[in-house]
Amino acid sequence: MSDAQRTGLLIVDLQNDFLAPEGAYARGGAVSPAALALPARVAPVAQAVKAAGGLVVACQFTLWPDAQGEPMIAPHLKALRPFLRRGDFQQGAWGHQHVDAILPWVDVSVSKVAYSAFFNTQLDWVLRHAGVETLAICGIVTNGGVASSLRDAHMREYHTVVLSDGCAAFKTTTHEASLADMGTISEVMTCEAFTRQLSAQH
């Protein structure tokens, strides 16, 4: 396998309920403006990873319904996002789906219930069986799902790359501080630089 074929891309939480005008976060007035630019920026990276023979994984934040059909929401999230309601981020629903821009390039979808895409999921199993050694990570938010997933990948001894302009937070200062923090354990590259490096390895 080439280095490119041992490369995986993890796209964190680019879902309709987070980003679409009809989604849950738009309804609650909680969409990150910087995040709206990500699908168009990330899709070419996913396409390049696929073309090079790598694996594209996209995770989906999931709210599972209880016996009465109400979403089981962690207390801290319920306090932070009181607008979340029945049907939001529910598996199989439109809001739970990946945004259209990335759909054609996703090989594997992983449902998650917490910040990290590794927590109580089969992501590590999938990556190892696919031969992935280098994992590039992008999505939302920089200081939440992206940072948590990256640190869990680092602890599992993957070589990690965070795509600096492929992720976003609610505040620029938070985004930049999180990138600087992740830079102590990971490579930090722009989407363009990563794609260029991938092409050279292919």
Regions found by a protein language model. Name each.
Residues 1-8, 44-52, 69-73, 78-202:
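Active-site-adjacent betaalpha module
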Residues 11, 58, 162:
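Short beta-strand "acidic-cap" motif of Rossmann-like dinucleotide-binding folds
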Residues 21-22, 69:
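Short, solvent-exposed loop/turn and secondary-structure capping segments
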Residues 57-58, 136:
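A structural signal for short, well-ordered beta-strand segments and their strand-loop junctions
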Residues 59-62, 140:
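Short, well-ordered beta-to-alpha junction loops that form the rim of enzyme active sites
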